[in-house]
């Protein structure tokens, strides 16, 4: 019996290894691989009409044009150091999260199984582009798969991460106003992309401008080696941002959400075309696409699950999107009701409605003020870093769009607290190459950094994060100092309680767990953990 089970496991492992092997596409003309970038110094590179630079704002800026494979190759060659560095950061964070080599190996094959048909769900155009970028990937991770297979799989990391962890560190917020709700009636869209894969992963943000051989020109906020889109706007004044919704564990691969978003940006000029593209693609997780269109002068949310699609149109002059569905078709499903009851999404939505109602006529500056808001419902102090806040102090990036004016503001570090710098898509795409290094932001439209950066609270939050990281790394901390650094945050007490419980200091742990219950807790799962720990201590 044991021998038969072992044989079954071996056959299963071989099957997964075989089905997860992904061969690169066959590209007719690969001459772009011979192209070389020109180094002009100070981090400024060019390759034909394409260019890459490091802005004084701290953001990287990239312009790429041409055929799919060429775009990928050029992207990879211009951003080569960032492609390698980003994979290093990603792999390093995975090692931190999963210290066991055996478990990481198992995860590799599990992801391989999920993504066994991934290439069959990606268009030839995007496979060619990803193949081009992958030629600049590091040779150090061949044990995880070929360069092409790895980079392709990374495009599904957002999907698998949010399905496996059920929104852990993927709690985004987006909203928009237009008509009577905006100061000059112009549409304004704001979004926080709260996707956290470690501090280093968020260091090298790229504001990328793409001029593809087919479709529309568009911009995205991205990172090295990633050709998909999570936040972007095209030259038709159509913007797209994505927010994760609750998903069940995927059983097979489909089109990564980021590539569906990119396809909408590249090929849709209005809401109906965006809906048609979203409907045509199979996805293996549930997602909300907030699509704003200058042509339609409104925004809607395309809500999509692996089985269904519905559209939420508020038929008002504003729209709010957190991490639950609102349409008639998908809003009443069992999974969505659970999401509303057990996650931070509904609370954050309620806070957003409060802020909009108190906002008056909206402006870009007011939009950014909302995106930076750390308070809870009724302006409650819920601590710094709470998932129930609009600003959770983990954002990879934050953006504001004015689709009719083709303007976009992008946050600078840290999170959404630094300056928001502005780009005019008309001006950027009119450059037709760049021979000398120069700033492309519109300095007259910069929104200043948040004054919170100058406060003792901010310094205490940095201290809190450092102590939290020390605990995660297995180090020692003073739990009184930990709690004092962020006393209104339930997680301060949970961290202290877990730390003390592990060291068998049960009375002190109990005190912290009980204090946590007096604070605003982000999710039902976390509250259940606290109550379970209290029960275990009392039963000792």
Description of each model-found segment:
Residues 150-260, 396, 400, 408-410:
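Internal mixed beta-strand/loop scaffold within catalytic domains of large alpha/beta enzymes
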Residues 220-223, 233-236, 285-288, 307-314, ...:
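A general structural signal for short secondary-structure boundary/capping elements
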């Amino acid at each position: 019996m044991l021998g038969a089970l072992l044989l079954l496991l071996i056959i299963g492992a071989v099957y997964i290894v075989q089905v997860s092997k992904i061969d690169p596409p066959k590209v007719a003309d690969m001459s772009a691989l011979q192209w070389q970038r020109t180094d002009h110094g100070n981090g400024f590179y060019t390759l034909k009409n394409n260019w890459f630079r490091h802005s004084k704002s701290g953001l990287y800026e990239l312009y790429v044009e041409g055929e799919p494979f060429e775009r990928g190759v050029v992207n990879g060659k211009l951003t080569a150091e960032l492609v390698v560095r980003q994979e290093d950061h990603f792999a390093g964070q995975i090692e931190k999260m999963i210290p066991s080599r055996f478990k990481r190996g198992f995860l590799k094959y599990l992801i391989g199984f999920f993504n066994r048909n991934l290439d069959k769900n990606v268009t030839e155009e995007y496979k060619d582009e990803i193949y081009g970028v992958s030629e600049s990937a590091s040779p150090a991770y061949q044990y995880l798969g070929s360069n092409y297979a790895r980079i392709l799989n990374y495009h599904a990391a957002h999907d698998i991460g949010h399905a496996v962890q059920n929104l852990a560190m993927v709690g985004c917020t987006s909203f928009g106003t237009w008509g009577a709700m905006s100061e000059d009636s112009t549409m304004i869209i704001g979004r926080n992309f709260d996707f956290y894969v470690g501090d280093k992963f968020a260091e090298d943000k790229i504001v990328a401008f793409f001029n593809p051989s087919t479709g529309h020109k568009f911009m995205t906020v991205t990172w090295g080696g990633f050709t998909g889109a999570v936040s972007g706007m095209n030259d038709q004044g159509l913007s797209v941002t994505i927010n994760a919704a609750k998903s069940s564990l995927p059983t097979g691969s489909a089109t990564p959400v980021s590539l569906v978003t990119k396809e909408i940006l590249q090929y849709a000029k209005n809401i109906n075309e965006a809906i048609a593209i979203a409907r045509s693609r199979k996805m293996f997780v549930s997602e909300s696409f907030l699509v704003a269109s200058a042509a339609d002068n409104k925004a809607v949310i395309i809500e999509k699950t692996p089985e269904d699609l519905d559209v939420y149109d508020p038929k008002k002059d504003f729209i709010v999107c957190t991490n639950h569905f609102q349409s008639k078709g998908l809003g009443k499903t069992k999974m969505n009701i659970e999401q509303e009851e057990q996650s931070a999404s509904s609370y954050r939505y309620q806070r957003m409605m409060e802020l909009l109602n108190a906002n008056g006529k909206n402006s870009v500056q007011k939009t950014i003020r909302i995106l930076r808001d750390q308070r809870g419902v009724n302006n409650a102090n819920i601590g710094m870093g709470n998932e129930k806040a609009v600003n959770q102090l983990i954002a990879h990036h934050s953006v504001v769009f004015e689709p009719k004016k083709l303007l976009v503001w992008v946050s600078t570090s840290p999170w959404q607290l630094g300056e928001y710098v502005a780009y005019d898509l008309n001006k950027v795409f009119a450059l037709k190459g760049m021979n000398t290094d120069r700033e492309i932001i519109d300095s007259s439209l910069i929104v200043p950094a948040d004054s919170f950066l100058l406060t003792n609270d901010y310094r205490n939050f940095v201290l809190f994060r450092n102590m939290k990281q020390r605990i995660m790394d297995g180090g020692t901390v003073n739990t009184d100092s930990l709690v004092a650094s962020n006393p209104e945050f339930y997680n301060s007490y949970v961290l202290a309680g877990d730390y003390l419980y592990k060291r068998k200091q049960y009375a002190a742990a109990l005190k912290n767990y009980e204090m946590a219950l007096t604070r605003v807790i982000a999710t039902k799962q976390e509250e259940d953990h606290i109550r379970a720990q209290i029960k275990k201590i009392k039963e000792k």
